Every structure is written in C-alpha cells, then in structure tokens.
Curated annotation (Swiss-Prot):
Keywords: Disulfide bond, Electron transport, Transport. Belongs to the glutaredoxin family. YDR286C subfamily. It comes from Dictyostelium discoideum. Pfam families: Glrx-like. The keyword Electron transport applies. Gene3D superfamilies: Glutaredoxin. This is Glutaredoxin-like protein YDR286C homolog.
C-alpha cells in the first residue's frame, strides 16, 4: 500500500537560492543534493537551483542578496545561511509524511 502511494504522488519542489562564488552555498550543495538524491525515495523531492545574480532573477536578488543560501518549500524557508543537517532531514521527513497523508486522504 505505501509503495503504491509513494509511486503516485507528485514531487515536492525545493527552491534553492544561491549565487556563484558563495562558499556557504557550496557547503549547502554538498549537504542538500546527497540528502535528496540518496536518502529519500526516488523522485520525491526535486531541487530547483536559482542563481539570484542572473538578470531574470532580480526579485530574488532583492529579497535574498544577504541571505544565500536559502532553501524553500512552498513559502516555508527550510534553511538560510547555513544548513543544520539534522533539521533539514527532520523538515524533509515531516513534509514527505504530510504529503503522503494528504495524497492518501485524497484517494479515499
């Protein structure tokens, strides 16, 4: 039953705001990508990496220029500046459980 639910629900998008030359951003990448790709079920989370320095991302530059790296799911910030790896795992597990519960309830 759980496998069927996991195979049928949509991906959860993590927006990862970053910029070139940011050492904290590089450290965050070394934590978040393995967490999502190796430690959670395949394709349950996707990472949308957003370079705030690009011309078309000016609204993010204005908002996060002094705060990168920033990770968000929906409107919730799950990390800013430095990643607490334990908190990241806790947040991702909590969000995944909530999504599974929601999808299961919608199917019933």
């Amino acid at each position: 039953m759980l496998t069927k639910i996991l195979n049928n629900f949509k991906s959860i998008n993590i927006r990862f705001f970053t910029r070139p030359g940011c050492s904290l951003c590089q450290s965050a990448k070394e934590i978040i990508y393995p967490a999502v790709e190796e430690d959670f079920p395949t394709n349950r989370f996707t990472i949308e990496e957003i370079d705030i320095d690009k011309e078309n991302n000016k609204q993010y530059f204005d908002k996060f220029k002094n705060d990168v790296p920033v990770g968000m799911i929906d409107q919730k910030i799950i990390f800013k500046h430095r990643i607490d790896e334990d908190k990241l795992y806790y947040d991702l597990e909590t969000i995944l459980r909530q999504q599974i519960k929601k999808e299961k309830e919608e199917k019933e």
